[in-house]
């Protein structure tokens, strides 16, 4: 039986971050730290379980590059945006983020946290310099369908016609 030569790659030759199966809290943070950070930035602690910024940073280091677009469809307190901005400031990256949040705190907590992280927050010895950047905030209109699955007539005939035209043109 003929033997085939194989390329052997050693861990010491690898570049970048090598993932480990366990992330200790001193590397990745914990929920108490996440709650403290949220309180420092927007003076809010009512969110049940904010994610630690450092754990999101570690995920981004492993699964993205410096020009990635990061989507967080359950943005909560805005931790993902905070992590993206912090990582960009650290490594000179140009990552961008898209956050989606449907709860009523989207503007008062999520967007406000992002604004403060970009512009700076705190006072005196507790002042934290802004990380820079910018973002756009959008509000989606009324839902086309009501919870009972009927059409929401208050959106107007034009929106309903556009929806019908769109769905009828899908093959």
Stretches with model-predicted labels:
Residues 33-37, 92-96, 135-143:
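Short acidic (Asp/Glu) and glycine-rich catalytic loops that position anionic groups and cofactors
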Residues 25, 102, 142:
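Residues immediately flanking
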Residues 49, 56-125:
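Conserved S-adenosyl-L-methionine
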Residues 114-171:
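SAM-dependent methyltransferase catalytic region
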Residues 29-30, 104, 144:
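Residue-level detector of flexible, active-site-proximal loop/helix-junction positions
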Residues 16, 107, 111, 153-157:
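A structural signal for well-ordered alpha-helical scaffolds and beta->alpha junctions
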Residues 1-69, 96:
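Class I S-adenosyl-L-methionine
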Residues 5, 11, 76-77, 130-136, ...:
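A glycine-rich phosphate-binding loop feature that marks nucleotide/adenosyl-phosphate handling sites
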């Amino acid at each position: 039986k003929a033997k085939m030569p194989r390329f052997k790659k050693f861990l010491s030759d690898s570049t970048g971050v090598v993932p480990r199966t366990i992330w200790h809290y001193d590397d990745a943070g914990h929920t108490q730290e996440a709650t403290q950070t949220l309180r420092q930035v927007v003076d809010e602690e009512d969110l049940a379980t904010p994610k630690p910024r450092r754990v999101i940073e570690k995920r981004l280091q492993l699964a993205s590059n410096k020009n990635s677009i990061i989507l967080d469809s359950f943005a909560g307190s805005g931790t993902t945006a905070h992590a993206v901005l912090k990582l960009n400031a650290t490594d000179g990256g140009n990552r961008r983020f898209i956050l989606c949040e449907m709860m009523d705190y989207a503007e008062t907590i999520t967007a406000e946290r992002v604004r403060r992280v970009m512009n700076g927050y705190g006072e005196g010895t507790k002042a934290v310099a802004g990380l820079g950047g910018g973002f756009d905030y959008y509000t989606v209109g009324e839902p086309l369908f009501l919870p009972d699955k009927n059409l929401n007539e208050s959106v107007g005939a034009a929106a309903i016609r556009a929806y019908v035209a769109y769905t009828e043109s899908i093959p």
